[in-house]
């Protein structure tokens, strides 16, 4: 069997996207997130796909890589037809990714795979080493919720210095490009929580185009204000907002060693799967 490998930049054409989606149906697991399915058709997301077609134009595997925050820092993942995983298709796709990253002068190329033994063996065989893990959690939308007295949640109001200080306190200065990216992107909404006019928390929300989910990113509570229930209140409000927007679930990702993991669970968010990130030394 002869295979032809090609690289296509985002946005991908509709026929290719259809082939990729049909291939993903070969698995019971949902690989759409690490493979950036929601970005395949977008012209403003730097990304590309490596495609492995047979001589009969059957797609047997593909990899997808994307730079989600515009800093030349890519993540990538791959999927191969379950009946052909003993071949070297995965390694060929990884080689295509490496070439694509080199052509784009990427400063980083993290591999992201749902945590499972087959994926671990594959990515380790390519010389990658484990870096960190994130748990994807989801919650059902809430039909009713009322913020505690004195708290308000409003769209970002332009007070950039206060927002930057909050995010630096919760993370570090490396988060600032992400903050500005979230503010500038039209497909993201930044909300802030205030207590009697003072900023105490923030989150960025992204609506999945198929109306299935509302993603929470860059969620932060002022460290000085942690432990007072603000984080839980914000998360519950996000579930309410998901209902108001007609979404079927609210979703977020958090590193497995994050101290706030218990807060997410107490707010109704339950684990879906763990994505393991790998890097080359």
Spans of features found by a protein language model:
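Conserved N-terminal entry element of GNAT/NAT acetyltransferase domains
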Residues: 1-18, 129, 138-158
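Conserved donor-binding loop and adjoining core beta-sheet/short helix segment
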Residues: 8-12, 25-28, 35-101, 112, ...
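Flexible, substrate/cofactor-facing loop regions flanked by secondary structure
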Residues: 20-38, 147-217
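A structural microfeature
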Residues: 60-61, 132, 201, 231, ...
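Acyl-donor-binding surface of acyltransferase catalytic domains
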Residues: 82-149, 275-280
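Conserved acetyl-CoA-binding loop-helix of GNAT-fold acetyltransferases
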Residues: 86-99, 125, 221, 227-240, ...
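Short acidic/polar active-site loop segments enriched in Thr and Asp
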Residues: 107, 248, 270
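Short glycine/proline-centered loop/turn elements that form peptide/ligand docking sites
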Residues: 235, 257-260, 279
């Amino acid at each position: 069997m002869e295979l032809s490998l090609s690289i296509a930049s985002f946005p991908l054409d509709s026929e290719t996207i259809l082939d990729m989606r049909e291939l993903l149906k070969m698995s019971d697991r949902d690989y759409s997130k690490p493979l950036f399915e929601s970005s395949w058709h977008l012209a403003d997301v730097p990304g590309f796909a490596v495609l492995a077609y047979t001589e009969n134009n059957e797609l047997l595997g593909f990899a997808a890589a994307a730079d989600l925050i515009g800093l030349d820092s890519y993540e990538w993942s791959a999927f191969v037809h379950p009946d052909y995983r003993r071949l070297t298709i995965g390694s060929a796709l990884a080689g295509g990714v490496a070439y694509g990253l080199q052509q784009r002068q990427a400063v980083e190329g993290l591999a992201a795979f749902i945590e499972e033994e087959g994926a671990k063996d594959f990515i380790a065989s390519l010389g990658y080493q484990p870096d960190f893990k994130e748990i994807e959690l989801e919650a059902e939308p809430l039909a009713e919720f009322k913020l505690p007295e004195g708290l308000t949640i409003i769209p970002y109001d332009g007070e950039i210095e206060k927002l930057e200080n909050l995010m630096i306190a919760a993370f570090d200065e490396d988060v600032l490009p992400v903050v500005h990216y979230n503010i500038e992107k039209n497909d993201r909404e930044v909300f802030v929580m205030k207590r009697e006019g003072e900023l105490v928390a923030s989150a960025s929300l992204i609506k999945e185009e198929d109306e299935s989910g509302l993603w929470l990113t860059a969620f932060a509570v002022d460290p000085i204000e942690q432990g007072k229930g603000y984080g839980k209140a914000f998360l519950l409000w996000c579930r309410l907002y998901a209902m108001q927007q007609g979404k079927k679930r609210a979703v977020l990702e958090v590193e497995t060693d994050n101290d706030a993991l218990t807060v997410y669970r107490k707010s109704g968010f339950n684990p879906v799967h763990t994505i393991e990130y790998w890097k080359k030394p």
